[in-house]
């Protein structure tokens, strides 16, 4: 298949799934396997095209990010405090990711491990939604250091490809007292620093394997993921207040047999 067409297909998969609790890395690994695009370069491409999805969130939530630089009076998720909260959320996964980076890329970016993560993540989502609790945190201005760090610890689950960073942080937020729409919103915003760190680290480690001829391939990937992520986040934000995570869990369980049949068996 033409390289640019492969890049476009994978970028659309990335953009549509990055911020939904269905696992973008899992879908990318499986799509890449079907398209015959596998190996070290494919794994790095999957990370790099996240830049497009990151930019989509920055565009959609630009006021929140601008508030980190130029805080408004009475805004609590802003300025130095907002930056500290995001750092607390990013820190656990950054530390664990640095320690386990080689192991993760060597052993966890495989269809079999993705399949297990899809199923385990789906079961966890159903259990969280079945749990009755009263939210104590309604808006971003209610965020506390304890809640931010707790969500960061749950985010470590996303180092297992197939589990879903979005699912991990939304579930973590809900279990720790955040209302579902807030957990989703914070999940999107908190994704930016951790994804920038992961992308930058991967690029620095693997820069030597790329040439100028790869630039169009990556540009198509980033543009495609940007446009599709804009659409996906807008739709998810509109729905998350009215629906639970259970439909996404069911989707994960439904695709698991196909993953097993086409990728593992």
From Swiss-Prot:
Question: What further note is attached to this protein's record?
Answer: Bacitracin is thought to be involved in the inhibition of peptidoglycan synthesis by sequestering undecaprenyl diphosphate, thereby reducing the pool of lipid carrier available.
Gene Ontology BP terms = cell wall organization; peptidoglycan biosynthetic process; regulation of cell shape; response to antibiotic
Upper lineage is: Bacteria, Pseudomonadati, Thermodesulfobacteriota, Desulfovibrionia, Desulfovibrionales
Function statement: Catalyzes the dephosphorylation of undecaprenyl diphosphate (UPP). Confers resistance to bacitracin.
Query: Whose protein is this, by species?
Result: Desulfovibrio desulfuricans (strain ATCC 27774 / DSM 6949 / MB)
One GO cellular component from the entry? plasma membrane
Is this entry keyworded Disulfide bond? no
**Superkingdom classification of source:** Bacteria
Question: What is the gene name?
Answer: uppP
Q: What is this protein called?
A: Undecaprenyl-diphosphatase
């Amino acid at each position: 298949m033409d390289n640019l067409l492969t890049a476009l297909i994978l970028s659309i998969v990335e953009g549509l799934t990055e911020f939904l609790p269905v696992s973008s890395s899992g879908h990318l690994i499986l799509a890449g396997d079907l398209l015959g695009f596998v190996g070290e370069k494919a794994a790095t491409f999957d990370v790099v095209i996240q830049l497009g999805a990151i930019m989509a969130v920055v565009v959609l939530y630009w006021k929140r990010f601008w508030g980190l630089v130029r805080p408004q009076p009475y805004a609590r998720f802003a300025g130095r405090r907002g930056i500290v909260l995001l750092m607390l959320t990013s820190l656990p996964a950054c530390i664990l990711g640095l320690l386990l980076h080689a192991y993760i890329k060597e052993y966890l970016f495989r269809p079999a491990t993705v399949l297990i993560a899809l199923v385990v993540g789906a079961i966890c989502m159903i259990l969280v939604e079945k749990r009755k609790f009263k939210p104590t945190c309604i808006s971003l201005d209610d965020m506390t250091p304890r809640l931010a760090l707790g969500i960061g610890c749950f985010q470590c689950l996303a180092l297992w490809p197939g589990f879903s960073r979005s699912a991990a942080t939304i579930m973590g937020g809900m279990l720790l007292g955040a209302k579902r729409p807030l957990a989703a919103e914070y999940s999107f915003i908190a994704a930016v620093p951790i994804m920038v760190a992961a992308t930058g680290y991967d690029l620095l480690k693997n820069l030597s394997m790329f040439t100028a001829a790869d630039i169009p391939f990556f540009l198509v990937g980033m543009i495609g993921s940007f446009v599709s992520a804009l659409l996906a986040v807008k739709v998810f934000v509109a729905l998350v207040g009215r629906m639970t995570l259970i439909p996404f869990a069911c989707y994960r369980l439904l695709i698991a047999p196909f993953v097993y049949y086409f990728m593992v068996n």
